[in-house]
Amino acid sequence: MEFPIGSVGTTNFRRFTPESLAEIEKQIAAHGAAKKARAKHGERKGQDEKPRPQLDLKACNQLPRFYGELPAELVGEPLEDLDPFYSTHRTFMVLNKGRTISRFSATWALWLFSPFNLIRRTAIKVSVHAWFSIFITITILFNCVCMTQNDLPEKIEYAFTVIYTFEALIKILARGFCLNEFTYLRDPWNWLDFSVITLAYVGAAIDLRGISGLRTFRVLRALKTVSVIPGLKVIVGALIHSVRKLADVTILTVFCLSVFALVGLQLFKGNLKNKCIKRSTDPHNAYNFSSQMADNFYIKNGTTEPLLCGNGSDAGHCPSGYICLKTSDNPDFNYTSFDSFAWAFLSLFRLMTQDSWERLYQQTLRASGKMYMVFFVLVIFLGSFYLVNLILAVVTMAYEEQNQATIAEIEAKEKKFQEALEVLQKEQEVLAALGIDTTSLHSHNGSPLAPKNANERKHRIKSRVSEGSTDDNRSPQSDPYNQRRMSFLGLSSGRRRASHSSVFHFRAPSQDVSFPDGITDDGVFHGDHESHRSSLLLARGAGQAGPLPRSPLASSPNPGPGHREEGQLTAPTGELTTGAPEDLALEAAGQKKNFLSAEYLNEPFRAQRAMSVVSIMTSVIEELEESKLRCPPCLINLAQKYLIWECCPKWMKFKMVLFELVTDPFAELTITLCIVVNTIFMAMEHYPMTDAFDAMLQAGNIVFTVFFTMEMAFKIIAFDPYYYFQKKWNVFDCVIVTVSLLELSIAKKGSLSVLRTFRLLRVFKLAKSWPTLNTLIKIIGNSVGALGNLTFILAIIVFIFALVGKQLLGEDYGCRKDGTALWNEGQLRWHMCDFFHSFLVIFRILCGEWIENMWVCMQVSEKSICLILFLTVMVLGNLVVLNLFIALLLNSFSADNLTAPEDDGEVNNLQVALARTQAFGQRASQAISSYFSSHCRLRWPKVGSQLGVKPSLTSSKAEHHITADAVNTAVGTSAKPALSGPKEDPRDFITDANVWVSVPIAEGESDLDELEEDIEQNSQSSWREESPKGQQDQLWQIQRCEDHQVPNSPGSGMSSEDLASYLGERWKSEATPQVPAEGVDDTSSSEGSTVDCPDPEEILKKIPELADDLEEPDDCFTEGCTRHCPCCKVSTSKFPWTTGWQVRKTCYRIVEHSWFESFIIFMILLSSGALAFEDNYLEQKPRVKSMLEYTDRVFTFIFVFEMLLKWVAYGFKKYFTNAWCWLDFLIVNISLTSLIAKILDYSDVASLKALRTLRALRPLRALSRFEGMRVVVDALVGAIPSIMNVLLVCLIFWLIFSIMGVNLFAGKFSRCIDTSNNPFSVVNSTIVNNKSECRNQNHTGHFFWVNVKVNFDNVAMGYLALLQVATFKGWMDIMYAAVDSREINSQPQWEDNLYMYLYFVVFIIFGGFFTLNLFVGVIIDNFNQQKKKLGGQDIFMTEEQKKYYNAMKKLGSKKPQKPIPRPLNKYQGFVFDIVTRQAFDIIIMVLICLNMITMMVETDGQSEEKTKILGRINQFFVAVFTGECVMKMFALRQYYFTNGWNVFDFIVVILSIGSLVFSAILKSLESYFSPTLFRVIRLARIGRILRLIRAAKGIRTLLFALMMSLPALFNIGLLLFLVMFIYSIFGMASFANVVEEAGIDDMFNFQTFGNSMLCLFQITTSAGWDGLLSPILNTGPPYCDPNLSNNNTSKGNCGSPTVGIVFFTTYIIISFLIVVNMYIAVILENFNVATEESTEPLSEDDFDMFYETWEKFDPEATQFIAFSALSDFADTLSGPLRIPKPNQNILIQMDLPLVPGDKIHCLDILFAFTKNVLGESGELDSLKTNMEEKFMATNLSKASYEPIATTLRWKQEDISATVIQKAYRSYVLQRSLTLSNPLRVPRAEDDDAPLPGEGYVTFMANDSGRLPDKSETTSATSFPPSYDSVTRGLSDRVNISTSNSMHNEDEVTSKEGDSPGPQ
């Protein structure tokens, strides 16, 4: 950490002069020379040493305060760069008034202007000026507004071009053009500007029609707003980041869609051309004539489209008189087809995005057959749900990563800031110790740092500061100002909160004293988009070898001893410090920060230094304080003077009375009730209304408005306006009341009637007392805050695309002057003639509906442009940006928030009021009961004692009793109540001594379940308060009870036998607890009672294992029965009852037997299956009908028998306390009742018919019996509270829109229709203007005045309409009706009310988008909660441990395998060498791709020749792949089938050959076989493509996620199937006879079980449910006939609207919102897991690769390799485990154990290499031990070898031996030389003389290379724990120091020479 505090003062800012430039040149030269020198010596500069730019000095950031105040004369002037990084770059910086940093190149601009040229300096000054940016931004915005207009003069366009040209010229003059850094074109945003300007000039120069396309690029100017507003750049960064991340998903999506498209092409090509054509009466006339004539087509009822058909048995059939023939055109303007790969791909993309896919589904099934539903199920579930949600998962992840990075930056910066302040603080202490009075400097304005407005600040806080600093006796904490300052300086004891849940979350500055960003001049915080400073304050100077911080010393008149003239800093020792700033900082830190210390400074400088320090601190802290103030101090003083009303004492008294009144809890309760009643009043509005009802509602409105106005007035007087308006809720109230008063003064029918809708916002006041609503509003608020920038980006995207559409395609839509569009003689609603309509089209695409608009566009304009535009909007806008929205939403959402809202410490008055009311009610009821008991002398207790009943906790009224005193104390002392606080555990009151419970006298025994239920009831209704310590003893017996239950808690791991004995002991020892008598309240009749625990036997019966052993049924009746009716209590020891007891035991054994259960499951399945046959055609099949009636009776008897058996076996008590048994009981009763009714011939009664339909619930009984479904149901049940919460909140949100809809549209959706047309048409408003005219003109009987079926006539219908809008199904009709509406009973007119579109846009954003995505949030969160509850082991591991754990887990499951041995036969060997080469695999992959391409070329109706060629090519590929298969089998022999992929290839080859053979056979027998079979066989070819997956790693990860999801998805699928099954049975019973219209026709209907399932599968994704509901909403003419006779007894083809609405809305909520979202939750969860696996440092693949490489080095799979081969092995590995050569030293340092023969075990190597990748961690020794044990168990080879040494030991021994050898040789050599020297004089001491050969020895030792440092290897010695003994002694004896210096190696050598290691 560099502490740049040394750099305060104005001296930081020095003008950039030619000398500065010369200095930079010198630095660059020195830097280059140093670099060359390093290169010459072969040194590599470490990565850590690379200097990086300081984050806080980035261009566009604001300069932090610490650098001092910028003198006015230097604003906009070139300055020397403060960032040391740029000391070797030819740059300078410029600061504007707002201290924003701009960097410029110091080279010559355009080779003409030097940095000191006057023209260039002026351009620089202009370009950095704030007003310049503001002017350009305003110009851009104005230009955008102009572009939305249709007919703009060309001159305006030229004006804008001139302004942009001027801007570009200024920037180019200031920056230079493109060659150097920081020049104009080096900024990518300027590319955009430049291209826009260039294109403008090109367009002006060449005025041609084709060039108008160029003009479209003007639109890109809107993007310039992004470059001007800095916050947006970050979001764009996140978007680009997520788009990059989408690469893998995009590849997978394209691959999957291609495969599905190929399947579609093979199955359905040409089918959609089949249409029903009139049979020709002329036998000679060829059919091809009639097939082309549109007049001959059969038109589908209610539409203008020809009816499709197919020739298959289950395809759609033609009516009589028509024949099914293939025509030339496909449906939807010939765009919907599978005729070629491109169209099939488009259809599949449409299916994936689920845009009107139900239409494609119906067309395809009608043309091909119902069996192809399977194709759609696969595509929707695997393609659509999986792929689209993968995109969501990836975008969410990318966003999270971006978020984490930003948060990390903020935190690092805060830490540095904190450290810097600590340094400042220390420095201040030093100065104080030196006797400089820092306090006197507080008022000093002479400091160069003193801010301009320091005087104002000084006056404001002078008194506080001086008090705090001069009075030594006062503690600093006693003053809030000081306290804040202390905590700010990091001196307080409390820790700061670091809660960054999201970067984009708005956090009020008051929440924590941290500096997320630079603070500007005016004390405003800058948003999180600014980059975060790595070093806050480091200055720079010109040193010799690198940038040096310049100290204020440089400018001081008489510097201290640490100063040199040239601006270099010297340490006190006098040495010149040079080098990088990091080195300097370290060095300075090492010397106790001498360069910061004030100790060696002389007096004048100390004073200046002190002023700087104090000035920095005060300036920063005061600025923080100011930023917290909402308005300027002068306004605050004014407000305090005039807005706090304190007059005479009487007024004050009046105020106190009002204060008591408005703060009373009952006032809050009253207001809440009024809000609820007011809301109900508003919701009661409907059409048509009687005048009396209307008058009542009006009167109610006036009363409520007056009431709320009074409330506001009272509160303002009681609190004073000053305090009243500081609360947001009060401001909210005030606005609503004002609008309500305004609305009362306006006539009801006025244009401002929409003001009434503002009253609806009162509903939000409920949030004050409804925590869930409050939380949700907060979530949406947070998201909207967080989404500010993103919303802006989305708005820009919509704006740009809308303009592009208008410019490119507008003219093609046949636009007229009034902005409407004509096409094919009809008006278009969706066109791009004007900006508003263009915006609507783009918005509709963002809602996911793109295909229909695109068809129209392709009809009127160029197909390619339409395709590109629409798909770009769809992919960019919908899939990326909207998913980023959802990611943000999920990020700010958590079910914790919903289930446990944070307690803000305030007493909830509503709860207090409710508690008071409750207490009053309980006291009243108690008084009454005590009165009756004293008079009537009831004797229940006596009965209880006769029966031997033990007292216990049971549910009774008295249980909810709270002492009145307790309530009063709570309210009086404002104790914190926790009434029904969801975050408390229901059992808390047992363990919490502060909770007061009054316990009633027990009535009989209760089992554990009852006890828990009672506890839950108690917790929800009991009043909690802090009670005095004395009262705590009263709960000790309850706590003891809790102690009894502990062992029975789930997961306690106690065996049932232990439990039995434990409970028995406890029971005996604590049978009669004593109760302390003190503190018992008179008012309670029951507090002194004992509370016993249940009998242990009772508990034991609840334990399943023991229940089996006991095999004895429970008591038959409940305690209540036996108490009230003693005859029910029987003695089993007496005669008649003994037999009964034996019977019960027998029944119990039967019921508990597994066979019995299996039989019942079988019966349930059979009976459910039987229901499926009761369809609409049953009356025509008398045999089937009679058989079904018979089987129905049989099933009913069986189920009744089962129920009776269970009653006898379990007893009533156990049977009726089980929820699943209740379900069985109800379903059996339904069957029984309907059977009895049938026998008594009452079956035609309507109510009994409805009862019969309830038999559809029978399959529900299967739920409890299938484990998979039960798991899902349990998970769902767990999520129900949260789901209900969200549902309720959605309803509240929607209520507002629904009431608004009723206000706007009630009665306005009616219209006059002409039924003579098909489909019915709306009569033009010029012919019929209103209802009466429609009735008068109905001469033909064809005119009907009808209402749109889904409308806003009342709030309930409004809800239905909103559900259709939110699911985007049927919303068009509702919108059209709204937009065309005029007045009540007036005929609608085309787009008369155009801007009503905006009502729907707003609802879709808030009501649809937010609320429906909250479902995803809730469910995902609940899954995660439950996962944590179930598998908590992960939570207690650190991230690092998890990495290790996962890596070890993976490598533990692997072991070396023998490679496939090379065959001995030379031919086989040759082939083996070919097929095992990588090149062979690559060739095969290329061939597969080519095969795929040839399959894509196929089209419908291709020529014979093309068919032949493609057939031959196919045969060639089959031959190639067969050849590959044969070669591999020949070479690999039996080993071929050991690989899964080989087996897959083999199957594909067999199928391919089979399909060729079958094709040949079928060709000759074409007339006998259906072509479908032929097509399905050809699909085998597609299997080959799937082999590509083998090669793509990214795709494998994503598919791995899918594979992991499959089990869970299967369970969810089962549940979904069950729901569909039940609903289809209901549908058959209720809607079989509705008229065929809209979505219901002869194929998609509820007449048979199969057809019902087709319909329900379609609406599982909510697709087309409006079409299915539409006919069911018909109640009479002209739509249906209620008197029509049908097949069966029921009459008419009208529907039942109520049943239909309930049926469809419940199904949509269950399937589309809940079950499908569970599916999504599972996918997201598993995707995260899979991605974690793939992003971990070591993946499964790395370990596989390790073992694959191992096989080459250890062909015999001995699991050992020679130490000599280790270096090659390490180098051969790939990926993170590889250790490239030269690696000898690293390997030796790993200290690997050696076994005899110098071999190393694979596990040791893998452990060491893994550690090399993951780094040190001391926590995992035990894990390694476990791993090794596991490995030993599976691979016994290792256990037989005990290590004898390690690689390090071996090296040391080797070196020691070498050293001794060399020394000895040297000695021998010298000796022989000496002895042979004839001049030598022999001496007696020769033998003991020291050897003179030390230099030689050292040289030899150095030769053997660098030795490892023992400190690097000590932790490795424990690596394989079993070898500790080998290495421990070694580490004790040997001490090796690592260094490249000879000096160190000398030491080692001498040591080794002295103590040789054991050999």
From Swiss-Prot:
| Protein family | Belongs to the sodium channel (TC 1.A.1.10) family. Nav1.8/SCN10A subfamily.
Please list the residue ranges annotated as the IQ domain. 1853-1882
Q: Lineage of the native species?
A: Eukaryota, Metazoa, Chordata, Craniata, Vertebrata
Instruction: Tell me which residues are glycosylated.
Output: N288, N311, N334
Q: What does this protein do?
A: Tetrodotoxin-resistant channel that mediates the voltage-dependent sodium ion permeability of excitable membranes. Assuming opened or closed conformations in response to the voltage difference across the membrane, the protein forms a sodium-selective channel through which sodium ions may pass in accordance with their electrochemical gradient. Plays a role in neuropathic pain mechanisms.
Mind telling me which SUPFAM superfamilies this protein's record contains?
Voltage-gated potassium channels
Quaternary structure annotation from Swiss-Prot or TrEMBL? The channel consists of an ion conducting pore forming alpha-subunit regulated by one or more associated auxiliary subunits SCN1B, SCN2B and SCN3B; electrophysiological properties may vary depending on the type of the associated beta subunits. Found in a number of complexes with PRX, DYNLT1 and PDZD2. Interacts with proteins such as FSTL1, PRX, DYNLT1, PDZD2, S100A10 and many others. Interacts with NEDD4 and NEDD4L.
The record's IV repeats, renumbered to this chain, cover 1460-1759
III repeat windows: 1142-1451
Q: Where is it located?
A: Cell membrane
Catalytic activity entry: Na(+)(in) = Na(+)(out)
Species name:
Onychomys torridus
InterPro entries from the UniProt entry: Ion_trans_dom (IPR005821), Na_channel_asu (IPR001696), Na_chnl_inactivation_gate (IPR044564), Na_trans_assoc_dom (IPR010526), VGCC_Ca_Na (IPR043203), Volt_channel_dom_sf (IPR027359)
Q: Give the domain section of the comments.
A: The sequence contains 4 internal repeats, each with 5 hydrophobic segments (S1, S2, S3, S5, S6) and one positively charged segment (S4). Segments S4 are probably the voltage-sensors and are characterized by a series of positively charged amino acids at every third position.
| Bias (Basic and acidic residues) ranges | 44-53, 523-533, 1943-1959
Keyword Zinc tagged? no
Q: Name one GO cellular component term.
A: voltage-gated sodium channel complex
Annotated protein name in UniProt:
Sodium channel protein type 10 subunit alpha
Effect recorded for R218G: Decrease in inhibition by the venom of Centruroides sculpturatus
Q: Where is the composition biased (Acidic residues)?
A: 1004-1016
